[in-house]
Amino acid sequence: MAPQQGRPALPARCEPPAAPPVPPRRERGGRGARGPGVSGGRGRAGGAEGRGVKCVLVGDGAVGKTSLVVSYTTNGYPTEYIPTAFDNFSAVVSVDGRPVRLQLCDTAGQDEFDKLRPLCYTNTDIFLLCFSVVSPTSFQNVGEKWVPEIRRHCPKAPIILVGTQSDLREDVKVLIELDKCKEKPVPEEAAKLCAEEVKAVSYIECSALTQKNLKEVFDAAIVAGIQHSDSQLQPKKSKSRTPDKVRDLSKSWWRKYCCLA
């Protein structure tokens, strides 16, 4: 399926701003390391040996989810907006010297896909819950729609709250259109507070156009996804040791009881 392209239209009631300039395509190897302990190349499709991390992007339609993925995996920026149904990308990175395949699942945010979208949630290690910082409506839906949906299907999966289109915070045309609707960009402090309330791992603002904080978003997703995957293995080990621990505690308690008697 062809990837979504172009700056998405704002989901708010305001008219969208003029399309931003398209940055030149960069060489894949020109951006350096992918954060502490995380490095490697990126690309669509393909696979890699080693462990995998499944990352699902959710959020209202037209907030720029696909633009994040395309910008991250290709170092380019889409020039045309085509609503996404569902799409999969992959990025091979190195974590502590070991290959990790980051599977990126781009989902549709429109209501007509509400019944199909959860089919992508199976075995998800990390959710990137996206809203546009210049769309108060998409921010409101974080708590009203998206967190309940995620918790209903994947109650233990971690969430990173992502504020997209941060490059439009100071865009004059966008601010004028928002003012016509008596609205303003979502305050960063309000987004951070929301992240705390929904118990998200963190809140990160980024821009697919300028790539500001783009790698931080996916680095955080990789780390949180690996931690979640590892934590899912711990209960099994703990359960097998529980009877032994109970017996040891019982023996210790019995010895103390005998001494007191």
Curated annotation (Swiss-Prot):
Residue ranges, compositional bias (Low complexity): 7-16
Keywords, comma-separated and alphabetical: Cell junction, Cell membrane, Cell projection, Golgi apparatus, GTP-binding, Isopeptide bond, Lipoprotein, Magnesium, Membrane, Metal-binding, Nucleotide-binding, Palmitate, Phosphoprotein, Ubl conjugation
Lipoprotein is among the record's keywords: yes
Pfam families with a match to the protein in the record: Ras
A Gene Ontology molecular function term of the record: GTPase activity
Cofactor(s) named in the record: Mg(2+)
Ranges annotated as biased composition (Gly residues): 32-48
InterPro entries: P-loop_NTPase, Small_GTP-bd, Small_GTPase, Small_GTPase_Rho
Principal location: membrane
Region: Disordered, residue numbers: 1-48
Modification after translation, per record: Tyrosine phosphorylated by SRC in response to PTK2B/PYK2 activation. Ubiquitinated. 'Lys-48'-linked ubiquitination at Lys-180 and Lys-251 by the ECS(RAB40A) complex leading to its degradation.
Numbered residues of crosslink Glycyl lysine isopeptide (Lys-Gly) (interchain with G-Cter in ubiquitin): K180, K251
Protein localization: Cell membrane; Golgi apparatus membrane; Cell junction, Focal adhesion; Cell projection, Podosome
Membrane topology of this protein: Lipid-anchor
Function statement: Binds to and activates protein kinase PAK1. Plays a role in the regulation of cell morphology, cytoskeletal organization and focal adhesion assembly during cell migration. Also stimulates quiescent cells to reenter the cell cycle. Has no detectable GTPase activity but its high intrinsic guanine nucleotide exchange activity suggests it is constitutively GTP-bound.
PANTHER family: RHO FAMILY GTPASE
Family: Belongs to the small GTPase superfamily. Rho family.
Protein name per Swiss-Prot or TrEMBL: Rho-related GTP-binding protein RhoU
